Every structure is written in C-alpha cells, then in structure tokens.
Swiss-Prot record:
It comes from Rhizobium meliloti (strain 1021). NCBIfam families: cbbA, FruBisAldo_II_B. This is Fructose-bisphosphate aldolase. Belongs to the class II fructose-bisphosphate aldolase family. Its cofactor is Zn(2+). PANTHER family: D-TAGATOSE-1,6-BISPHOSPHATE ALDOLASE, D-TAGATOSE-1,6-BISPHOSPHATE ALDOLASE SUBUNIT GATY-RELATED. Transmembrane segments: none annotated. It catalyses: beta-D-fructose 1,6-bisphosphate = D-glyceraldehyde 3-phosphate + dihydroxyacetone phosphate. InterPro entries: Aldolase_TIM, Class_II_FBP_aldolase, FBA_II, Fruct_bisP_Calv. Keywords: Calvin cycle, Glycolysis, Lyase, Metal-binding, Plasmid, Zinc. Pathway: Carbohydrate biosynthesis; Calvin cycle; Carbohydrate degradation; glycolysis; D-glyceraldehyde 3-phosphate and glycerone phosphate from D-glucose: step 4/4. Binds 2 Zn(2+) ions per subunit. One is catalytic and the other provides a structural contribution. Zn(2+) 1 binds at residues 84, 198, 232.
Amino acid sequence: MARITLRQLLDHAAERSYGVPAFNINNMEQGLAIMEAARASDAPVILQVSRGARSYANDVMLAKMMEALEEMYPDIPLCIHQDHGNNVATCLTAIQHGFTSVMMDGSLKEDAKTPADYDYNVSITAEVSRLAHMVGASVEGELGCLGSLETGHGEAEDGHGFEGALDRSQLLTDPDEAARFVAETGVDALAVAIGTSHGAYKFTRKPTGEVLAMDVIEKIHERLPDTHIVMHGSSSVPQEWQDVFNAHGGQMRETYGVPVEEIVRGIRFGVRKVNIDTDLRLAAAAAFRRVADTSRSEFDPRKFLKPAMDAMSAVCKARFEAFGTAGNASRIKVVPMPEMARRYASGSLKPQSARSEAA
C-alpha cells in the first residue's frame, strides 16, 4: 500500500460515512503506537506534523521515519499531512519531504499570532492550492480562528495561535463565507471554528451548545454538502488518563475536552478529519508517571516508553472504532499523486458548487 493523499482518503470516508482521526506525531514511539493501532483496526491513517514537530525532529529524520512506517505497515493507507502551515514555503517544503497533504492556515498571518482578514486568507490559500495540486498533493484551509467561546482566547500550540481576545463572530465560521472560501480557494478540506481550541484546557465544564457550536457544522454541511469538514482541537482529554496522571504526582487541573459523541455527531454532518494531539500526549505522560512512581529504581527508557506506546495505541483504537474508521484500510486502492495531479488539471476534482439557502 502506498501513501495516500488527504483528498482521496476523505473522499472514501465521505462515500462510506466515516471520519478519520488525524494524530500529531513527533517521534518514533508515537508513530509505532498509531500504526500498530491502525493495523489492529484495519484503519487508514493520517499522521500530521506541526512546524514545531519539524523543528524538534528535523525534516530528514521525519522523512526517513515515515518511509520506515510505510515499509513496516504496507497494508495501511498512510496520509502524511502538514498541520497549520503558516506560509507557502512551509507547505512546499513539506511536500518536498514526502508529505501528501498540507494545511495552509491563512486565518492567521505568517507570524501565526495575528488574525488575518478574509482576502489575505483566500489569496495565500488559493496560491498553495494551485501549487500543491500541480503535483497531486491535497490542501486543507481554515476559516475562522480556533479559540474558546467561554473566554475569547486561543491556546498557542507550538507557537501557533492568536494573541489577545476575539469576539464570538471571529471564533465561529460563517456558513455563507465558507461557501465563498471553498469556491475561491479550491481547497480539498475546510477546518472550521466552532469553539474548540488547542491543548488540554478547552472547556471548564462539560461543553454544551453555548461553548461548542456543533450547529455551525450542520449549517456549513447544509451549504457545502460535498466539502470535507475538519474539526481541530478535538481531543477528548479522557478523565481516566487525567486521573492516572494526577494519581502519580501530576498536577492537571480540572478540564473537559470534546466529547466523543459530539465528534460522532459531527461525522454525520460532513466532518471527515478529526485532529487529535493532547489525548496521546496525556496518555503517554500518564503512563510515564505511573512507571516513575511505582518503579522508582527503574532507569531503562524502554520500560517507560513501552507502556506509553500501549497507552497511546489504546486511545487510537478507541477513536478508530468510534469514528467508523476501523475496517476501511483494506477497502482502499491508493491513487498515486501523479494521477491525482492529472485529475486536478482536468478539473474533475474542482469543489462542487455550494447549495444555496433557497435550494
């Protein structure tokens, strides 16, 4: 099985009405944990890499690691995705290193801190789409800024996130504007703002429609029934792993993530890609703490890393099952990037027209 583009994978997910978790990766242990879970679940995989991860691990190391994972798990369709690209160069160098998909986040300017206006977002996202599609790579865009509807603030992740406070209109994607954006940029997937944010501290209470606007997804799907919607900041921050973390010396304050059942609801309304990072970090860190606390003489890193990998795999398997991803890897016949490039050039992959409100 070869590497798969995000567009082909999400097209398949739409045809079969499932969602695909996109797990952030920094190192070998995360990669092995995710791929083992995928093999056990017969699930296709999206491994995504932030700019911070590229800086931490180095592009050469990441590229070789992805090659190794592809070779070790030949039956798993593997999409390699740049998360939150901040400029054209970030996206193109990712493709240069073997990524099959990139996100151009034009909701913020190049500093990844300053909210951008609509015209800037359209201009830079359309340029990345034009260039990426020439070589068959997929593009995800973002409209609206990720941040909390409770506080108006965002949470920076690897240096990416707006500073200060925004009003509610800036923190929610407008469905009509979304229809224009997809038509003007040609993106393959659209990340929307609905009140989720990066990191562990998303909500101070179990989220309701007041702070997690799932109705926005339904309205966008109604306007854009053929567009693949992406939910960012969608870790569920499992209570059981919070408890393990704190039971063994951690100091995580009370917090709530995005409930799995709400994500499943989103999948019914066009959500095809679900970004998850904190859940794997938390599971791994909790497993580390448990070993350090219960085996205080232990100093072999493998004795810490193996339980951490098992913990991450368990989270991945649960998400593959809940989102309906399980059982679909073996159903996919990968289309090579040169063929995807030909299809883009022919216009056959052009976004479908939005459904009008009157329709």
